[in-house]
């Protein structure tokens, strides 16, 4: 067993060190073999041999740790020499293309701002009133169960949508209002099509009663979707949202299969892209507005980016793999 420590002293790198460890301490190593021999011994001879094995094993383990420390320090020193960088040398900064989510945000903003929509940014932390109650979602409303919310102890929460920005804007301004808001939102969900943090964009137009009609909303939405996706077909479906009445959802013809039917569109030929509607009077009453009308719409930025980039896993946008991000 003296030869084990002698072999250890001759080790010069991590690979040889691991080989020495396995030959001594592995399942088929020298010490395992010695301990296995104890079953053939009896009495004092067995006890004496066991003590001797333990003595050499402890000596080897101590020598191994010292050698391991020395090898790691030596390899680190060698690596630092090889990786030494001359900071005085010029090095061109590597740039890449815009992140798909940033590209999508900018494309949306470029459409709405020339139409007179003002970009509003709100807080990520909200209270119950702005996130729920003011949007016709009182505490007992079943629609709250659809949103797994991150709550804080002081009755604050991480906003589950960007709609609170609309409430703040209406509280701070008087009609006419024409705004869009975008940013991070949070819900407790994580799978191929959901992440705990995601981005939304919403729009709001408010003016004196009778000045804003559903036809205005329809025109804006159709112009935007044709601008964003090109020559796609559109389908309007009636829907329900507590904060709009009437409400609608808009689908586009599948960009993956051209309506021939595929797994992405569930073989329907249609893909849901946004929800919209005329602002519910209950929302205006919560703000204190009278004799006004307006429309609102909202969509997920990741959803739009997934369709334009034609990817199936939403989580790809949040990974730091440059090979993936540079492919968009």
Curated annotation (Swiss-Prot):
Molecular-function GO terms, alphabetical: ATP binding; magnesium ion binding; phenylalanine-tRNA ligase activity; tRNA binding
Cofactor info, note text: Binds 2 magnesium ions per tetramer.
One Pfam family linked to the record: Phe_tRNA-synt_N
Positions of Mg(2+) binding: 245
GO terms under cellular component: cytoplasm
Classification via CDD domains: PheRS_alpha_core
Cofactors: Mg(2+)
Main subcellular location of this protein, as a coarse class: cytoplasm
Classification via SUPFAM superfamilies: Class II aaRS and biotin synthetases, tRNA-binding arm
Catalytic reaction(s) noted: tRNA(Phe) + L-phenylalanine + ATP = L-phenylalanyl-tRNA(Phe) + AMP + diphosphate + H(+)
Localization annotation: Cytoplasm
One GO term (biological process): phenylalanyl-tRNA aminoacylation
Assembly with partners or alone: Tetramer of two alpha and two beta subunits.
Protein name, per record: Phenylalanine--tRNA ligase alpha subunit
């Amino acid at each position: 067993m003296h030869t084990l420590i002698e072999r250890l002293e001759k080790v010069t790198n991590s690979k040889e060190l691991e080989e020495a460890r396995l030959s001594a301490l592995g399942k088929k190593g020298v010490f395992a073999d010695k301990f296995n021999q104890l079953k053939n011994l009896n009495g004092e001879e067995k006890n004496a041999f066991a003590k001797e094995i333990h003595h050499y094993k402890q000596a080897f383990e101590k020598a191994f740790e010292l050698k391991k420390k020395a090898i790691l320090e030596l390899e680190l020193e060698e690596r630092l020499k090889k990786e030494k960088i001359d900071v005085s040398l010029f090095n061109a900064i590597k740039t890449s293309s815009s992140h798909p989510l940033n590209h999508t945000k900018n494309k949306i903003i470029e459409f709405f701002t020339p139409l007179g929509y003002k970009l509003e940014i709100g807080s990520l932390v909200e209270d119950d009133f702005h996130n729920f109650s003011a949007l016709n979602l009182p505490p007992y409303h079943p629609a709250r169960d659809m949103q797994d919310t991150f709550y804080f102890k002081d009755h604050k929460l991480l906003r589950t949508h960007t709609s609170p920005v609309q409430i703040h804007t209406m509280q701070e301004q008087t009609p006419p209002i024409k705004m869009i808001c975008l940013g991070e939102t949070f819900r407790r969900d994580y799978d191929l099509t959901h992440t705990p943090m995601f981005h939304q964009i919403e729009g709001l137009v408010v003016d004196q009663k009778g000045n804003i009609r559903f036809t205005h909303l329809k025109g804006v939405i159709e112009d935007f979707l044709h601008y964003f996706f090109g020559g796609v077909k559109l389908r309007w479906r009636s829907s329900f949202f507590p904060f709009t009445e009437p409400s609608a959802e808009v689908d586009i013809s599948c960009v993956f299969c051209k309506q021939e039917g595929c797994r992405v569109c569930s073989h329907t030929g249609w893909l849901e892209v946004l929800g919209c509607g005329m602002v519910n009077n209950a929302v205006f009453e919560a703000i204190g507005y009278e004799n006004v009308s307006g429309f609102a719409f909202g969509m997920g930025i990741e959803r739009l980016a997934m369709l334009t980039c034609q990817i199936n896993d939403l989580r790809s946008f949040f990974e730091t793999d440059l090979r993936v991000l540079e492919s968009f």
